[in-house]
Amino acid sequence: MPRPGRNTYSDQKPPYSYISLTAMAIQSSPEKMLPLSEIYKFIMDRFPYYRENTQRWQNSLRHNLSFNDCFIKIPRRPDQPGKGSFWALHPSCGDMFENGSFLRRRKRFKVLKSDHLAPSKPADAAQYLQQQAKLRLSALAASGTHLPQMPAAAYNLGGVAQPSGFKHPFAIENIIAREYKMPGGLAFSAMQPVPAAYPLPNQLTTMGSSLGTGWPHVYGSAGMIDSATPISMASGDYSAYGVPLKPLCHAAGQTLPAIPVPIKPTPAAVPALPALPAPIPTLLSNSPPSLSPTSSQTATSQSSPATPSETLTSPASALHSVAVH
């Protein structure tokens, strides 16, 4: 036999769960829905125990409202004063309590993911959806916002929406169809060929003929490039970049490079300096070997003939020795 309910309780804690207390407050309303503040007020008016430590049990009650499927949240209509949404019981959880008593629950009410916040019965589902649609339309009308105009093809659920005429510039059709152009506006086919870093085999003869007038010592009568002499085009003579290696370095039967290089001047014979005056050799011969740092060099120079390079350096050595003495 279920325990009889009482309208009021003393300061002791009532034997009801937070779900039972919330459901009791919602069902006591004539509209079967209440805001959160009215739920708090109903519980505190009926059960004096919850008039103390309000923050603790109100937080627990809010968690039960949010994480239990038996409660649904209904937005407030624009014509209703106040703020906050309403909380109501799910239409399918009417038999959640045994014999109408809030002390016992049959089982935890759970809504499937595919049917979340939607009633199981078709009639209740249609009524619930119509009510939600009316609330949203009235809220939009009060706020002054307009629904965006969608094309008719968007509402055709049976067919496929026709693609629009606009195509993204990076679509595959545009990439294939359009002509590749440079940033300056010229196509690749209209560009001039870029000259190679080294002359190609068919350009060596023209380069030699054009440079022959400016380089007579290289492209003279014994020029390095002869138009009558064919240049070898064997596959082994070419590098990985298509530039011939052998014609650039040495042609057949030639010892000088084909590319013009600066030619160093040949050193001419330096004329012999005039003979030293008589007093300087006399002083050098009379000086002792220990005082003359160049006595060994002087003896060597007297025993062997002087070369041109020694002739260039001997006056400086002689003058240095005279200054020391």
Swiss-Prot record:
PROSITE patterns: FORK_HEAD_1 (PS00657), FORK_HEAD_2 (PS00658), FORK_HEAD_3 (PS50039)
Molecular function GO labels: DNA-binding transcription factor activity, RNA polymerase II-specific; RNA polymerase II cis-regulatory region sequence-specific DNA binding; sequence-specific DNA binding; sequence-specific double-stranded DNA binding
Subcellular location: Nucleus
GO BP field: anatomical structure morphogenesis; axon target recognition; cell differentiation; cell migration in diencephalon; epithelial cell differentiation involved in mammary gland alveolus development; floor plate development; hypothalamus cell migration; inferior colliculus development
Pfam families: Forkhead
Superkingdom, natural source: Eukaryota
Region (Disordered): 284-325
Primary location class: nucleus
Residue ranges: DNA binding: 12-103
Keywords from the UniProt entry: DNA-binding, Nucleus, Transcription, Transcription regulation
InterPro entries per UniProt: Fork_head_dom, FOX_domain-containing, FOXB1_B2_FH, TF_fork_head_CS_1, TF_fork_head_CS_2, WH-like_DNA-bd_sf, WH_DNA-bd_sf
PANTHER family: FORKHEAD BOX PROTEIN, FORKHEAD BOX PROTEIN B1
Function: Transcription factor expressed by neural progenitor cells in specific regions of the embryonic neuroepithelium. Essential for the mammillary nuclei maintenance. Negatively regulates the proliferation of oligodendrocyte progenitors and promotes oligodendrocyte maturation. Also expressed in mammary glands, plays a role in lactation, controls development of mammary glands and the inferior colliculi of the midbrain in the central nervous system that regulates the milk-ejection reflex.
Protein name: Forkhead box protein B1
